[in-house]
Amino acid sequence: MYNRVDGEYAHTEQAEESSWPADGSECAQTLTEIARLESLAPGELFDRMGLCFSKPHTSDAIDDSSNTSGLSTSSLSSSSELSVATSPVRPLFDYRTAELPQANVSGICVGLAAEWLLDLPSSASSRMGVLLPGTENHRSAARRQEQSEKLKTQLKEDKAEGSHNFQAKSTILRDAGLEPSAEETRYRFGTSSCIDKIVNELAQDPSVHLVSLKFVQPGAGTHTIATATSNGTTILSDPNYGEFTVPSDRVGGLFKSLAERYSTLNKRDISAVVTQRIRYGHPNATDLALFPRAEPHR
C-alpha cells in the first residue's frame, strides 16, 4: 500500500519495489535498466503518455473531509529548502505566473509540452495564451499528439525494440526542431534524497527537460510536463494548470506542491518522475538564456 505522507511503499507494492536496486542507486535508473529488472518489454514502459487529467482551475482550498489520510503536512522534503516533516506544503497556485485553462481536456500533454518548449523566448502570458483551445498552437499540439500515438502503434505492430513511447516522443520533438537526449532517467519519488536528485537535474543552469509523472494508482497513466532553467530561475509548464516560476533552489518545494495538488484533488499519487533532457535547438532561440526572466513568486 502506498503511504501518501512519507512516499514509501508497504508490502502490497513489493513488485514495484523489486524494480529498484539496493546498491545506493535506488533513486535513479535508465528506462532500459527498469525494463530488464521488471522483465517487461521496454515498449510497455510509460506507453500511456497523454492520459492526462486535472480538476477545474479552482482555488487550492482543500476539503479535509475528502482526505482520508488527514494530510495537512508533508515529509516529501527537499534538503535544498531545509524542509522538515512538519513543514506545510505551499499551495501550488502560489507559484503560478500564467494560467492555461481547459487546454488539456483531450489529453494532449506531450504535444502541449512540445509547443511550450518551442515558444520559450516569449513571455509567460504569451506562452500560455498561444496554447489556449482554438489557437493554431493548440491545434498543432493536438496534431503532434496524434502523430506520437500513430508512431507508437506502428512501432508496436513492427515489434520494434526499445520503448515505443520514447521513440515516438523523441521523433515528434525532433520534427519540432528540438534536440532530445537519447536517454531517459527515472527517479523514485517520495523520499527527500530522491527528490534532491530530481531537483539537481532540473535545476542545472541552463537546461531544458521534458518530464513525465508516473502515478501509483493502476490505470492512472502518465502525465507530461516541461521545465526550463536559466539565470537561477526555473520555469515549469504543466498543461493541466499553467506555468509556474521559482528560484532554482526552490524547485523541490514546487514539486512537493505539485504532488500535493494531484494527490489531494485528483487522487493521484506520484510514484516516479522520468526526465529527458532537451537541447534547445530552436532557430529563434539558439541560447536558452534568451527566454525572458519572469519574476518568481517569493
From Swiss-Prot:
InterPro entries in the cross-refs: Papain-like_cys_pep_sf, Peptidase_C58_Yopt
EC number(s) given by UniProt: 3.4.22.-
Gene Ontology biological process terms from the UniProt entry: proteolysis
Pfam families reported for this sequence: Peptidase_C58 (PF03543)
The keyword Lyase appears for this protein: no
Positions with biased composition (Basic and acidic residues): 1-14, 137-162
Domain of life assignment: Bacteria
Residues annotated as catalytic: C109, H223, D238
Keyword Protease: yes
UniProt region (Disordered), positions on chain: 1-25, 59-80, 137-166
Family: Belongs to the peptidase C58 family.
NCBIfam families (UniProt xref): yopT_cys_prot (TIGR01586)
Name of the protein described by the UniProt record: Putative cysteine protease YopT-like blr2058
